[in-house]
């Protein structure tokens, strides 16, 4: 009776017992005949066969004629006039005209500065400095949307980072190099595109120094992060781990020059209005001037009077404030603005829902009363435009669950009762009204 040999192995008997002998699965040589043997799941290969395979592959590669490389065009962001930038922002962002105008001019000058660097003479005495931007405004006023829309318009890589996740190097959390790693990923690892991208740092007010007094304990997520950000905000060559951070310390670093990266920082800066009002009240003493107050506290116009000293008192260090020369404030959205946000922008949330329903062959309609009710609930929540989607999503989830199964339905009308009480919307099939299917 003969027994088949397991691939790459044979069993031999000796005086000390039975042993397995290993053979190369390609040439048949035993482990004793070669220098090394590499084992796979069901096969073995010796060093001689590896060398032979390598020589064959090298000959095949060399036999292929080289492909002529077309020289790549240098990456050039779209240089759009400030007026065109503002008009484009207006298609997606409702209101905030002062902030849009300020952003449009700052962004235009930033990329114009980049274009002029190549033409600038070495002996030119005038050097245009970088114009990073600080956006100050309540939650849900459009800070992130403005930055995102700018990047889309200019066709440059864009990345968002939450400042609250950042800590000093050596502490648990993300270090500032993570910001650049995310932009590198957004640019598909194209270094030239990365170095002309836009980074939006959200919640920048959360890294304000916790106290005006110098503390003996280290503030690793406040002043320490501000100090770490100074270098990349101003412009420096930073070694960035492509996989992002401290989890892969062995990876090779990619050097990114940040001098042409535009940084837009945004935050609500809750309580800043009180600091400004305090300063204004002191400076106006003796002249009978008073700071006007409203139901929401200080005059909404008060933030427009912000100065660098106010930001310093709030907790930002002077060096950090100096890296953000363009300061723009956003207004609290009123009822009319929120109503317009629901229906006017190109990507308005109601238009998005209508598009989704259209894919199922259903026409979606919101009554005027329903839209008013959405705005009213959003205002009560106090989170600005951000609440609009939350209110609608809470109502629409059940309807979107049912619609794909309602094959004969051609129209769905959302009423005020649907928004307020989650009552059934009005369904239409041809000329007949249908009730909601439970």
Swiss-Prot record:
Note the SUPFAM superfamilies from the entry. Glucocorticoid receptor-like (DNA-binding domain) (SSF57716), P-loop containing nucleoside triphosphate hydrolases (SSF52540)
What is the superkingdom listed in this entry's lineage? Bacteria
Q: Which Pfam families match?
A: AAA_2, ClpB_D2-small, zf-C4_ClpX
Q: Name one GO molecular function term.
A: protein dimerization activity
Offer one example of a GO biological process linked to this entry: proteolysis involved in protein catabolic process
> What positions does the domain ClpX-type ZB occupy?
12-65
Q: Does the keyword Nucleotide-binding apply?
A: yes
Keyword tags: ATP-binding, Chaperone, Metal-binding, Nucleotide-binding, Zinc
Can you tell me which family this protein belongs to?
Belongs to the ClpX chaperone family.
What NCBIfam families does the entry give? Answer: clpX, PRK05342.1
Assembly description = Component of the ClpX-ClpP complex. Forms a hexameric ring that, in the presence of ATP, binds to fourteen ClpP subunits assembled into a disk-like structure with a central cavity, resembling the structure of eukaryotic proteasomes.
What task does this protein carry out?
A: ATP-dependent specificity component of the Clp protease. It directs the protease to specific substrates. Can perform chaperone functions in the absence of ClpP.
Name the record gives this protein: ATP-dependent Clp protease ATP-binding subunit ClpX
